[in-house]
UniProtKB/Swiss-Prot annotation:
<keyword id="KW-0732">Signal</keyword>
<keyword id="KW-1015">Disulfide bond</keyword>
<keyword id="KW-0325">Glycoprotein</keyword>
<feature type="domain" description="Chitin-binding type-2 3">
    <location>
        <begin position="170"/>
        <end position="227"/>
    </location>
</feature>
<dbReference type="GO" id="GO:0005576">
    <property type="term" value="C:extracellular region"/>
</dbReference>
<feature type="glycosylation site" description="N-linked (GlcNAc...) asparagine">
    <location>
        <position position="88"/>
    </location>
</feature>
<dbReference type="GO" id="GO:0008010">
    <property type="term" value="F:structural constituent of chitin-based larval cuticle"/>
</dbReference>
<feature type="signal peptide">
    <location>
        <begin position="1"/>
        <end position="21"/>
    </location>
</feature>
<feature type="disulfide bond">
    <location>
        <begin position="54"/>
        <end position="70"/>
    </location>
</feature>
<feature type="domain" description="Chitin-binding type-2 2">
    <location>
        <begin position="90"/>
        <end position="148"/>
    </location>
</feature>
<feature type="disulfide bond">
    <location>
        <begin position="203"/>
        <end position="216"/>
    </location>
</feature>
<keyword id="KW-0964">Secreted</keyword>
<protein>
    <recommendedName>
        <fullName>Protein obstructor-E</fullName>
    </recommendedName>
</protein>
<dbReference type="InterPro" id="IPR002557">
    <property type="entry name" value="Chitin-bd_dom"/>
</dbReference>
<comment type="function">
    <text>Chitin-binding protein that is important for the longitudinal contraction and lateral expansion of the larval cuticle during its conversion into the oval-shaped puparium case. Essential for survival to the second instar larval stage. Confers the orientated contractility and expandability of the larval cuticle by regulating the arrangement of chitin and the formation of supracellular ridges on the cuticle of third instar larvae.</text>
</comment>
<feature type="disulfide bond">
    <location>
        <begin position="124"/>
        <end position="137"/>
    </location>
</feature>
<keyword id="KW-0677">Repeat</keyword>
Amino acid sequence: MAKILISALLCVAMFGSMALGSPECPTPNGRFASGDQCDSYTECQDGTPVEKLCPDGLLFHQRTKATGECTYAPYSTCKERARLQPANGTEECPRQFGFYPNGDATKCGVYRNCAHGVASLTKCPEGLAFNEETYQCDWPDLVESCNAEAYLGFNCPAADSADDSAAAAVDVSPEGELRYYRHPQTCKKYFVCVNGHPRLYNCGKYLAFNSQTKLCDFYNKVPECYALLKEKQRLKAEKQQPQVAQPED
């Protein structure tokens, strides 16, 4: 009877240990974020833990309780796991992998996509800037390393400007005061000044910015733009007309 009781207690202890796991291996098999380092993880096989590092510049992302992978991700996702392996950068890249600003505050719509220490340049959609904090293309005024005015080539007029050309429709949003200005070189684009900083918007094909409605509208609803469009069409038609040969004397 005593032997049976001891065997039962041993079984309970063994299976209880397997169910609870260890700090290194919460389950016998899987990959788990480790310690305070954002680019390392523990790989467990049958309960045996092995510490591993992601390639330089990639961070470990815990997808489920037992699965994870090294992936491109901004450092801001590390939170309390703030430590990283020493950087192994090149002339082109701060680390072997990752997305990085190009270092020019006036051309912040282009960023470096680094793989194995080699950078390829990637462009954000027009008017947006690369945000290293989120690994996304964002409004230039929200990107610390970007000079929104120099990048977009537009300075928001002062709110109390007396210049008629600076007159703008005004809205108020949770972000602050919004002022709308047509692009000085084309009717198809316009700027929204948010707290004094510009953001570029683009109307769709066959549309122009209507400063009265603060929306993109048909050209014939925007008289000043419609006149420019008709003149442009006239000049284009003239260029396409065949040249008439002049008779020789």
